[in-house]
């Protein structure tokens, strides 16, 4: 089924890929991305584990209505989460040699 040394090479490649993925997971967990809404009036920075690290609100918004500010905060967080997921996909694609992950697949970190 496997040629001479084929299984050994396959196992070695799998181990190398596992090490690269572990390294990439650590990189991504430490990565910080900022999402914005309201043309940059609200900014939220999250890390690769989707933990909120920082919230910045332009002072001019503090005088406006509460509902609009809440919507802008939610939109900024969603933008940051989308950016983290895109970055994760890009980084993991480089490790997996472009192997496409199934739709909806979430990385375990």
Curated annotation (Swiss-Prot):
Q: Which GO terms describe its cellular component?
A: bacterial nucleoid; cytosol
| Membrane is among the record's keywords | no
Q: Which Pfam families match?
A: YbaB_DNA_bd
Where are the stretches annotated Disordered? Answer: 1-21, 89-109
Going by the UniProt record, its keywords in alphabetical order are: Cytoplasm, DNA-binding
| MF terms (GO), sorted A to Z | DNA binding
Keyword DNA-binding in the entry? The reply is yes
Location(s) in or outside the cell: Cytoplasm, Nucleoid
Q: How does it assemble?
A: Homodimer.
Name used for this protein in its record: Nucleoid-associated protein PMI0140
Task: Tell me which species this is from.
Answer: Proteus mirabilis (strain HI4320)
């Amino acid at each position: 089924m496997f040629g001479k040394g084929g299984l050994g090479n396959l196992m070695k490649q799998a181990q190398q890929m596992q090490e690269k993925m572990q390294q990439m997971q650590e990189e991504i967990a430490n990565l910080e991305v900022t999402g914005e809404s309201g043309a940059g009036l609200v900014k939220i920075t999250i890390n690769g584990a989707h933990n909120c690290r920082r919230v910045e609100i332009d002072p001019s918004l503090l005088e406006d209505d509460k509902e609009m500010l809440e919507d802008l905060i939610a939109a900024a967080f969603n933008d940051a989460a989308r950016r983290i997921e895109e970055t994760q996909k890009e980084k993991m694609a480089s490790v997996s040699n472009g192997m496409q992950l199934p739709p909806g697949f979430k990385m375990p970190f």
